[in-house]
């Protein structure tokens, strides 16, 4: 066994009180980390009631059993949370397993497909506790887990840089297109012949009733 505990969430719904402790529901469980922007919050009293069986702590893992099933995240420093519905608290045995490594392992297609293949529900996929507790994983030595985690983080950081570069490039492309259109509309995209008739004179010839405005672009 590589866990100290695997604890189901309370099967009740807690009302969002707008302030207090984060209530981790399945939408707040990302791929590796908690997504706490806009999270529902509860009072100290509700927090204590929902954590009566186990208080989530740093390096614990929270698993989403539904909507969407399969996401898993590690609790970080300063994340004092309680569980919403359809979530599971997993506490790895830290002398045997790195919490981040276990999180990555549970996010692999193999692990996700294995657990979801045992899920129930015709419309909404629901992973049962009975499928989570006996789940087997190959376990490398702790030092190897640390090395794997470091390598994964290195590659993920590189991917983030590429994604940011892609976003920056899209912004530049959009700005450039807007600038080209602006220059074209203002007659500045191609060299202008100083002997060309001013646009305002052309408009007067086309429509004798034309009344010029103060827009300087009609003067060119």
Q: What are the residue ranges of the model-derived segments?
A:
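Non-catalytic DNA-recognition/assembly elements of restriction-modification systems
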Residues: 1-8, 134, 138, 142, ...
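Low-complexity, Lys/Gly-biased intrinsically disordered segments
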Residues: 1-34, 47-51, 210-220
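A short beta-sheet element
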Residues: 25-26, 41-107, 126
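Hydrophobic alpha-helical scaffolding
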Residues: 49, 92, 105, 125, ...
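Specificity-determining recognition surfaces
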Residues: 70, 105-137
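Proline-centric
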Residues: 88-100, 113, 130-150, 156, ...
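Amphipathic alpha-helical coiled-coil segments
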Residues: 155, 159-162, 166-169, 173
